[in-house]
Amino acid sequence: MRWYATLALSLLGGFAGAALFSFTPFGGEATRSYLMANPEVLPRAMEVLNQRERQARIDPVRDQLELAFPGAVLGNPEGTLTLVEFTDYACGYCRGSVPDVKKLIAANHDLKVVIKEFPILRPESTDAARMALAAAQQGKYAAFHDAMFELGTPNADTIAAAARTAGLDMARAQKAIDAGTFDPFLRENHELASALGIGGTPGWIVGDQVIDGAVGHERLAEAIAEARES
């Protein structure tokens, strides 16, 4: 129990907090009393520890992470501030986050949103991801991205409809898909997600933060502001 409290104080109050714990008679019953009176300390401490561990994973893969598949970018392709999103077209939470991303782009003209196609929810997710990269190859990624989410669950019909809406050259797209052109990039995205501890969608990286789930515009805007200040 004592080491948990030491960890909590160290994480939440810095090393000074841990030192205070170590050099004052704050053990035994005092520790128990403190934790009983402040039950939120341990979950918060573990949350901070988890975030720090994930932050440490970002730097070794940052260049790879922020490098988009050519054309698979929303917002400003030359932007100096990068938001990375791991997404799956079968993910309702990803669909619900589309307006949040558009709002962020409108408010941050230097924001580059790098989309990492991360198909994990159903086999058709992979088909949609391949078509999305084919759209990127033809300079029509944003149009396909929006159309695919608007059409709902990916299947052969909705994927084809989204591709038509985006104006893809279907013969060219299918040829690239059949050749396996995009599969190495999808595998790389899965490897990146694993390295960062991302197991679901949407997953976000901005600055030194890894954020899980559909957290909403306000939380993402806050993370962008923090990245801008760092």
Predicted region positions:
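Extracytoplasmic thiol/disulfide redox context detector
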Residues: 2-123, 178, 184-200, 222, ...
